[in-house]
Regions:
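Alpha/beta catalytic cores of nucleotide-metabolism and tRNA/nucleoside-modifying enzymes
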Residues: 1-4, 9-13, 19, 24-25, ...
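Glycine-rich, positively charged N-terminal anion/phosphate-binding segment
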Residues: 1-4, 9, 18-93
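Hydrophobic faces of well-ordered beta-strands that scaffold small-molecule active sites
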Residues: 13-16, 38-40, 68-72, 95, ...
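Short glycine-rich, flexible loops that bind phosphorylated cofactors or substrates
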Residues: 47, 104, 233
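Active-site beta-loop-alpha junctions enriched in small/polar residues
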Residues: 18-20, 43-45, 73-75, 100-102, ...
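Aromatic- and acidic-residue-enriched carbohydrate-binding clefts of CAZyme catalytic domains
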Residues: 116
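Alpha/beta enzyme core
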Residues: 32, 78-111, 119-200, 214
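Residue-level signal for pocket-adjacent positions within structured domains
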Residues: 3, 13-16, 38, 43-44, ...
């Protein structure tokens, strides 16, 4: 699978952008376990152009993470364009636009999944951002606003026509938030639409190696994106890669092996602290989650 010139190989598995989760230390950890591409936490376009320090620091990426995508969100076209140009200066491999975040403080203000109620503005922003930068632009969104407005099949064509390089679809509506089950049937419909030629990345409820393989085989997606299933279990990428390659599950992980992961995470966090002090607390949260999972 390729996103423009970026070759992610066969059956790539990507780390989803997650607020308060995908900080530099966690991204590097997932990369070491086989994530083919990682995404930063989403970045507010409004805060970015106001030079809010905590927001600007989210643009810190390293070569060890590549390929890496920076994701932005917002509801104003000019602001999104200006933010996109700032992001491009950070030299990510990809710029991703968030049209899928369902939380009230984002969608309730018209950004993220809130854009699913304003498709003309969504397309205007997408077109403007694509035209404003030279790096590939991708989009992440949902099936639609609610069960009566699952518009993703038509919307995917419209977004493709705006010039995006790939599309990630979370298999829920905004109304579902993170409840119920992700509907991969519509993701498969988008992928099998003969008009679509850009890569389609599926996301939602991929929590086991077996489910990952099913998503590739049954729905034909070009890549699978792992979100909440990776939190406290960054080795899920290794498990899924092994299963895709061999058809077999990895042996159960030993406590000693998990402790070594924890030790390395502490080392990485301390090293990154010298550069990105603001991320230490978040890295500690990841460590705590790892311990709780055991």
């Amino acid at each position: 699978m390729k996103i423009n010139h970026i070759d992610l190989g066969k059956h790539p598995i990507l780390l989803a952008p997650m607020e308060d989760v995908t900080d530099p230390a966690f991204r590097l950890m997932c990369k070491k376990f086989g994530a083919d591409m990682v995404y930063t936490e989403f970045v507010s376009s409004d805060a970015l152009i106001r030079a809010v320090s905590k927001t600007a620091q989210k643009l810190n990426i390293s070569d060890e993470e590549r390929p890496v995508a920076i994701q932005i969100y917002g509801k104003d076209t000019e602001t999104m364009v200006e933010a996109a140009k700032i992001v491009e200066q950070a030299q990510p491999d990809i710029l991703d636009i968030n049209f899928g975040c369902p939380v009230k403080r984002v969608a309730g203000k018209g950004a993220g999944a809130g854009m699913l109620q304003n498709i003309p503005r969504m397309l205007e922003i997408t077109r403007a951002v694509v035209d404003a930068v030279k790096i590939p632009v991708t989009v992440k969104t949902r099936l639609g606003w609610d069960a009566n407005n699952k518009i993703i099949v038509e919307l995917a064509e419209q977004l493709q026509d705006c010039g995006i390089a790939a599309l990630t679809i979370h298999g829920r509506t905004r109304a579902q938030m993170y409840t119920g089950e992700a509907d991969w049937t519509l993701i498969g419909e988008v992928k099998n639409n003969p008009r679509m030629h850009i890569p389609i990345i599926g996301n939602g409820d991929v929590t086991t190696p077996q489910r990952c393989k099913e998503c590739f085989d049954r729905y034909g997606v070009d890549a699978v994106m792992i979100g909440r299933a990776s939190f406290g279990r960054p080795w899920i990428f290794k498990e899924m890669k092994h299963y895709l390659e061999t058809g077999e599950e990895l042996p159960p992980l030993s406590f000693e092996w998990c402790m070594e992961v924890l030790r390395q995470e502490v080392i990485d966090s301390v090293n990154l602290l010298m550069i990105w002090k603001m991320y230490f607390q978040r890295s500690a949260m990841v460590i705590l989650k790892l311990i709780q999972e055991w």
